[in-house]
Swiss-Prot record:
UniProt keyword annotations, A-Z: Cell membrane, Developmental protein, Membrane, Transmembrane, Transmembrane helix
Residue segments, region Required for DVL/RTFL small polypeptide activity: 15-46
Subcellular location: Cell membrane
Gene Ontology BP term (one): negative regulation of cell population proliferation
Membrane topology: Single-pass membrane protein
Matching Pfam families: DVL
Tissues expressing the protein: Mostly expressed in roots and flowers, and, to a lower extent, in leaves and stems.
Protein name, per record: Small polypeptide DEVIL 5
Primary location group: membrane
Transmembrane segments annotated in the record for this chain: 8-24
Gene Ontology cellular component annotations, sorted alphabetically: plasma membrane
Family, per entry: Belongs to the DVL/RTFL small polypeptides family.
Amino acid sequence: MKTTGSSVGGTKRKMWSRGVGGVVREQKAKLYIIRRCVVMLLCWHD
């Protein structure tokens, strides 16, 4: 019984870290897209 409790805690921790990693990756992707759009608009304006 004790081993199952620790394994559940481990899976929760893995899911939490994966969730945070996904959020960070999503933020980086959004920043990358916005940066690309700004560069394209600036180059197009010239």
